[in-house]
A protein has these predicted regions:
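Outer membrane beta-barrel
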Residues: 38-51, 61-201, 228-229, 254-293
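Outer-membrane beta-barrel pore domains
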Residues: 5, 9, 13, 29, ...
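N-terminal periplasmic/intermembrane-space "pro-region" immediately following the signal or transit peptide
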Residues: 1-46
């Protein structure tokens, strides 16, 4: 008991002598914990397998254009202050034919996002989406700025401007050797109850284009609109349309694009056993879409020219493991005249999320 009293007295003496140091240490630990909470990580491991068959491919009755890749993705988010956050996406892709696994990492996104009441701004390299037409026209990265204003819960307007590298170089003439171009768009959207609708205007600026009406202007324009109706919490129907322009090189392809899709439920990564399915009929066009959100769209020439039916389903095997399968059956509207234009495709994906 005497020893315990002596130890207690020694502890009290040391605590009094080093009280300032202990207090400062506590502050530093608290600051470190706060800083740690400022950065959060998420990501996935993804395996994709895709096969497209185009009967019109010269010299082949039926050719297979395959895609077999593994992806590792990291997505950090950082709190800057009460209004601003930072975001990034880093992808490391490995193709099946690259056994050395040295395809390398690529920073797909890096941007700052600010939120001030009803006003949102993104600056840097970020993902943009054509909300008006549910992704019929655009779903890819842009380096620039995007401003969104939502005056009410039902209405919002969005303006996007910057550089993008997803404008297919096959669509331009002259000395162009990359897919880069200047892109800007304005959109207005409405969502209330079971309904949503939108209207958008998109412009691509470049040196020259292969369209008859605009050969020396260096730009082309797309107007898109869409509407969606949710019959209940499980079933939703969407219809989207995009007006493009006439073209020279791909004159057999459609000028306009559209998509009609019926969705049932959908897999939830947090809910094992959840699933969803959809059926859609689409027509894509080289000058009416830029970087569509669908997995099927490019024909044998590498431009958006597929038309036909698409079905798909997804399923959550266990928490954070989701599988997807899709099938396309239709035709390639840009196929060589006189050749069979039949086109089919299969797409599968497994996501391991963390």
């Amino acid at each position: 008991e005497a020893a315990d009293n002596n130890n207690k007295a020694l502890i009290d003496k040391l605590a009094a002598e080093f009280s300032d140091e202990l207090a400062n240490l506590g502050v530093r630990v608290a600051d470190l914990e706060a800083k740690t909470d400022n950065v959060k990580w998420q990501g996935l491991i993804r395996y994709d397998w895709k096969s497209n068959n185009f009967a019109a491919n010269p010299g082949h009755e039926k050719t297979n254009d395959g895609d077999n890749t593994v992806k590792l993705r990291f997505e950090p988010s950082m709190v800057i202050n009460e209004n601003w956050t930072g975001h990034a996406r880093i992808d490391y892709d490995v193709n099946k034919d690259n056994t050395a696994a040295d395809d390398g990492a690529e920073v797909q996104k890096i941007y700052a996002e600010g939120q001030y009441s009803k006003f949102n701004v993104k600056l840097g390299r970020f993902g943009t989406f054509s909300d008006a037409s549910h992704g019929l026209v655009m779903d890819d990265q842009v380096t620039g700025a995007e401003f969104t204003y939502a005056p009410t819960e039902a209405w919002k307007v969005k303006a996007t401007a910057g550089r993008t590298d997803v404008v297919n170089k096959e669509l331009v003439t002259g000395t162009k050797t990359t897919d880069a171009a200047t892109y800007w768009a304005v959109e207005a959207g409405y969502a209330q109850g079971k309904w949503d609708a939108g209207l958008g205007y998109h412009t691509v600026l470049d040196t020259h284009t292969n369209q008859k009406t605009n050969e020396n202007n260096g730009s082309y324009h797309i107007v898109d609109l869409g509407v969606g109706y949710a019959f209940d919490k499980n079933v939703k129907l969407t219809g989207d349309y995009a007006w493009g322009v006439s073209q020279d090189k791909y004159k057999d392809a459609a000028n306009n694009a559209y998509s009609i899709e019926l969705d049932y439920k959908g897999a939830d990564a947090a809910d094992a056993g959840s699933w969803g399915a959809y059926v859609a009929y689409r027509q894509l066009a080289p000058f009416a879409t830029i970087s569509y959100t669908y997995d099927f769209g490019a024909g044998d020439a590498g431009v958006a020219s597929l038309k036909g039916w698409e079905i798909g389903a997804n399923y959550t095997f266990t928490k954070n493991i989701v599988a997807t399968a899709k099938y396309f059956n239709g035709k390639d509207t840009a196929a060589v005249a006189g050749k069979d234009d039949k086109a089919t495709g299969v797409f599968t994906r497994v996501d391991f999320l963390f």
